[in-house]
């Protein structure tokens, strides 16, 4: 395997279907067309890190720098996923390292990531990478009715 980490805002089309598959593996059914549309809507400062072996996508991380009144020094890993059959092979570590480099180059002092409470293998992975659990926040969500388009 010749793993490369690509940093991009607009990944090549050959990876769109594979991104949809990775997101679907995590319990969020997604189609290629959804990915193509969502990529065009991402904030301009967002970046994707793609772990690739040639034209095969093995994992990705979605990164965000948000400028707000409270957390100006923080960048966020919005999502990080490694293809199931390639987990525990160092790809996640390479993605996290690349995310930290990007955050530092973006002038940030912290990198935040969130993970579902049921994803205990991910918790162990992030702890092993030196991340500390921050239990000071609770996330609330409400589904909103959208007008028909």
Annotate each predicted stretch with a short phrase.
Residues 66, 83, 87, 116:
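Residue-level recognition of the GNAT/N-acetyltransferase active site
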Residues 96, 103-115:
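Conserved GNAT acetyl-CoA-binding A-motif
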Residues 113-122, 141:
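Conserved beta-strand-loop-alpha-helix junction that forms the acyl-donor binding cleft
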Residues 127-136:
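Conserved acetyl-CoA-binding loop of GNAT-fold acetyltransferases
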């Amino acid at each position: 395997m010749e793993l490369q980490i690509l940093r991009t805002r607009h990944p090549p089309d050959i990876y769109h279907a594979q991104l949809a598959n990775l997101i679907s593996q995590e319990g969020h059914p997604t189609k290629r067309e959804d990915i193509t549309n969502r990529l065009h809507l991402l904030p301009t400062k967002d970046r994707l890190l793609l772990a690739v072996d040639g034209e095969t996508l093995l994992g990705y991380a979605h990164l965000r720098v948000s400028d707000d009144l409270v957390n100006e020094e923080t960048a966020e890993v919005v999502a990080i996923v490694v293809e199931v059959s390639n987990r525990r092979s160092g790809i996640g570590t390479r993605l996290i390292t690349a995310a930290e480099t990007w955050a530092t180059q973006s002038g940030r002092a912290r990198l935040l990531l969130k993970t579902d409470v049921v994803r205990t293998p991910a918790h162990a992975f992030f702890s092993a990478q030196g991340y500390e659990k921050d239990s000071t926040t609770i996330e609330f969500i409400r589904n909103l009715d959208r007008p028909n388009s």
